[in-house]
């Protein structure tokens, strides 16, 4: 069965690059866009395997930052795997402290490390 990956709070161009990165890591995956809380609830109810969260959630979410949303998700969906997409080491450290898997930055998209991180998260 194909793995389900949700891109949470990303703009169109970033989503395109993330889709390419995900398809390189997991060819038969289903990638969905999550632009607000109702989309997120639907993805969680549908059994999403991995959430790739943007550092800043500009609209559509009760939380304004990805790390805040990771904390909330850990309380209500403790088994859902999350990763933060951010170039900032302090944001990555905060996400891991909140319960996320180690993420990656947008500048790393296309690198073997990103593909490995996504594959490992889906294993």
Where in the sequence are the language-model features?
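C-terminal output helix
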Residues: 108-118
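Alpha4 helix (beta4-alpha4-beta5 surface) of REC/receiver domains from two-component response regulators
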Residues: 64, 84-104
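The C-terminal output helix
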Residues: 119-123
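Short acidic, S/G/P-rich loop/turn micro-motifs used as interaction or catalytic elements
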Residues: 11-14, 56-61, 89
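Conserved phosphotransfer cores of two-component systems
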Residues: 45-46, 72-79
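Conserved phosphotransfer microenvironments
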Residues: 52-73
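Acidic, metal-coordinating helix/loop segments flanking the phosphotransfer/catalytic sites
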Residues: 34-50, 60
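Conserved acidic segment of CheY-like receiver
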Residues: 2-22, 33, 51
């Amino acid at each position: 069965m194909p793995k389900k990956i949700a891109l949470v709070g990303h703009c169109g161009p970033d989503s395109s690059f993330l889709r390419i990165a995900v398809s390189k890591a997991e060819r038969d995956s289903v990638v969905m866009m999550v632009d607000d809380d109702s989309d997120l609830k639907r993805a969680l109810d549908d059994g999403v395997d991995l959430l790739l969260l943007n550092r800043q959630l500009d609209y559509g979410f009760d939380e304004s930052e990805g790390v805040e949303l990771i904390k909330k998700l850990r309380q209500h969906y403790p088994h859902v795997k999350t990763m933060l997409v951010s170039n900032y080491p302090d944001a990555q450290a905060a996400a891991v402290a909140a319960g996320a898997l180690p993420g990656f930055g947008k500048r790393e998209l296309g690198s073997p490390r990103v593909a490995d991180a996504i594959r490992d998260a889906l294993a």
